[in-house]
């Protein structure tokens, strides 16, 4: 970044904002980059501002029992705020003085007032000077107030972030992500521009008092008639505003419903295409869109009338002020035109400035109170450690999480349940396990490990393993007992947290660099091969949570970070969840057992190999110590521990009834037990009321950016970013984000891809806490890159789940004193980590975009023509009256009084021509502004255009190839459907209407003035030319600065979410100072762009006003010097010239707003123009009597129409090559093999070898070459969707969209309830569905969070059974399953797909043993394709991975022992990253 010219700018340069000329010139000539932006002045840097405010806030906390944040702000900013307020007041006072001088100028043309004619020129000079003074006062004052607002926002941004890093985990569980993001977006954004209006809360009343005094002097009591009209108008506008909010509130729920479904569609677009659900999703979203648009139109009409009422009110105010006085006493022209000028100022003060100021204070004080409450929340406590201690000891440790009483929770749950539309017939479903809430997470834990020992912690789901580690870290505070260790701790979370930066920075993490240690860690964690594949090696920048890495790569980087730190105690929480068997084995031996052999280690695991090599084993069960000792002691004392804890061995021996009972209990335990708020309907915010049954089931919220996993319901989510965020300020437990934009300002729409987009979160019954985000895991198999995007709540932050054992903890770990923190931050790395891709659209909206927008709907052209006809008719009528006026010079009749008294022209008889003219012009302007015959059709048609564009964009996204979608960020896609569609619905129609109406008013006024005085037209031409050139010059730069500012906003929210996700790691490593510095860096980048945008905008506004001042000076002197005795002409010319000044500037701003908003149209068109992957084949809806398989009939020249395809499931793959993008690197090369009908094939290979990619290639989701045949039919001769229907899919990332069970199983409505129940019974879902009220009509929300991951897998299995697919693709189906559901799936696949071809990608050896053949993929190619016997007889990956015990299972005849073995200790299921263990949900 360059040094800002502001530092050395002169006073004159600062006054006229001339220091911004270099950036304006550069932006006009070329596209601006971040490097072109000026550095933030030191006075605006986040470090300095936050330090000052933090110092004053600490002072406030120390000195008072009830500290007030506003007092700290007052001490920091008050005097400058007062100074700029005085300047603003002086500038506004000039508006009241101008009409007085105008009246004197008109009076000087009185034929009997010759003595004043000589001073008319001086009065004109004085009037012009007032305009100059106002310009020099108002612009610095407005900019100064905006600058103060910006500084206040920056300081509070930083204060909130620092506080967030200090909050106890217990508090974090009670604060929603929505509340945090709202504090940093909605609330604080009000300060930047709103502060400029704050002073009008006292300026406007003073101004009204002054103006009414002057009007009293002119019209006596009649002046109050005009005031009464303005008050009535203000009340009418308030009523319209209330009605508008009513419709917007009703619409908010519908918008969120649509955005939730859209977000789920985008997040799971690969699954949507695999299931061929494009048509179903399109219909579902369009139905919601129709209901939303009805309310959108009503809200738009209310706002339209509000806007129109302001314009036409001017005539009535003047008319009702003057008319009584004229009837009673007669009136002179001077008083008429002076009254007009006074009323213009009065109307602005009463209807715009004062209400705006009151709203600003209301919003600002509310935001300050929210921030004040947040800053006073409980912080985590620093634990005391003994640095000389070498052992780790726990003595009689017990810990609780929940502080809230059980009775209160139960009452809330019952109340929520009673409020549901579908009654719950079995309340036990929601309340059966609430008694566990009062139970401790850990009970009476005792153990002692010496230096250098390895403690393996095992246990079932929810046993308390992670809680144990959190206790050692200090995040969970023990209620009894004591913990003893040195405090020098390193921690590896099971959540594979990756911070923005390079691989090397992620591993070193601020610790001093040691080359030998670094290389040793890389080697031990098996990262050498992965790093060597990157061109930048370990300096490759990982953005957005490392989403471009595989799950295994992220897990190994997280482990390497923990191992690299030199600590006394290493806490490793299930670090091997996403590693293949071979890699896991190598890392455990080389890293855990060798590299860290002399260190104390606590490893959470359930693998038998790990338990055997541990020095001590601690097995937890329901929070208690089930066993503590060595492995040999475990074999002797607890030989049945595996079946005791997991229910694994005995499951197949249970009866069908017993299995159903176990499955039902699994649903309760895994889905509902831990979260007391599972069935709570939190209080809905008044402004976001839901309508309809579907809306009753959820929160009005969608967080476009981060999904976390539900406790026990283990489903990986990919973060999206969203725009627009609302929050309930009254209820601290409220979990709500909203994408509903503030229709009053385009900047109010934040998405935040970047929010940070994120996935959807319904306003449902589950708690959306920050802790959910900490326990969130990014989907490991997703190929998208997710983010949140900026300009309007781009940020997509949405935790989608709770956790289990990651309870809420309230203590901090002391910072490691040995850390050498490196605070250097590379700006390019920061940009690469955080920024969105630069939009490939022109810096200024092209005429082609306008033309294309106008021609979307043919009615729009007709409406615009109709508007033009009305305008021409009004102008023609005005010109006719002017012609009559010019050709019928009135003879003025005088009201003569006694001699010595002066006479004044009174409005009677012929003189009333002027008065009649003014009435006519007022009526014409009223029709022009109100536009009843023009405005309503225009607004209505523009909303229809928005509807058409949304439909086209939705269809385009659904039909776009995955290669195109993979190149886009999901947050960016969601922003098109949220922020941009909101702009097309709300802002663009009314902004276009305002611009057209203002432009026509200005053109009409110029026409009138030019007819009265043709010389003025000569002055108008250069003014218009200057305006057009200046606008074009400014737009090139301003739009680029706005885009850079929008991109710069994303890092702020992304960094907040990143920090929260890794908060436990941050605290364990003591990296809070580094992340505060990183946050300030991101904040300064945004400030640099925003400050420069405000400065250039003020430069432009000032230049526009200077041009208008010159124009007014020219008009004034031309009219004075060329007009004869006509008072009327001078009055009309000067009054309209003053009106032109204000209206034209408003029109200029509107034109800039239109151009800015039209960029959303450009982005939508860009999505509409995406390529299509193939014409969709309409789904065939069979009759109820048809067999299920009849749906697979295809129209193809190779198959007879009476035949059914596929019939056997034979697959022949020839030279298959796959690429993510066309022309990219091949990720699979020359794959060839064949599969016989009904054969089971297992895919083998290391993490990232391409197993999941091969399954995607089968579905034609990638760019592929080669050929695949199914039962002799080639994919080249088969329609794309029909080809995909041949496959049944159980993906690694399960897709449950928001809707009923029936809709999720049968989105097209093809099957009867009887058929659905039959399939549900086959896959073991019947007992699950029957537990819910409404059964098949129960509405699932938030990705089906009330279901465990296993039940979601069963849903996918049921879909495949319903489709009667002959080929089943399974991608890690058991990755996140409890053993019970895993057995159900294994049994169902054996039975339901006994005659089908099955292709399985799996990490569990026992599942792979059932396959007849194995395809070994290595380095993107097929290395082996053979039977299991052949692979075991050769040296292969499979032989290295399989254990001797598994070989005995395969070949039992090789075991000479004939006796029946007793209960064996079998491998406990390894709990993966998503299997968050928690005893409280």
UniProtKB/Swiss-Prot annotation:
One of its GO terms (molecular function) is chloride channel activity. Residues 1453-1462 have a biased composition (Basic residues). Keywords: ATP-binding, Cell membrane, Chloride, Chloride channel, Endoplasmic reticulum, Endosome, Glycoprotein, Ion channel, Ion transport, Isomerase, Isopeptide bond, Lipoprotein, Membrane, Nucleotide-binding, Nucleus, Palmitate, Phosphoprotein, Repeat, Transmembrane, Transmembrane helix, Transport, Ubl conjugation. It holds the Pfam family ABC_membrane. Coiled coil: none annotated. GO terms for cellular component: apical plasma membrane; chloride channel complex; cytosol; early endosome; early endosome membrane; endoplasmic reticulum membrane; membrane; nucleus. This is Cystic fibrosis transmembrane conductance regulator. The gene is CFTR.
